[in-house]
């Protein structure tokens, strides 16, 4: 896991400066139903540990290998809408207030979607994450 690069307040300021009022998490119907039944948004690792039903992802093995299987990813926009197409993560979209970041124990912002180039996660964290708040502005 990467180190702490910025505070939650710094991230909130950047989100607000860019008019990002909501964060988005898309998933399959099966996984989304587990979130609803168990009243929470869980990482894939946590879902597995608790025995909650979820849809397998083609990236699971690589995510485990590179230590991101316990991470939860959000988008800063509605990818369904932006791409004018179905979201590759699934048809169910959860929309959260940007204030959800205050509930996170750790925040890291990736330079690009980790689904692309997952085999390169052996590179150093500076190549995968924004490492200072100024890079986000």
PLM region descriptions:
Residues 1-137:
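Active-site-proximal loop/hinge segments that shape catalytic or ion-binding/gating pockets
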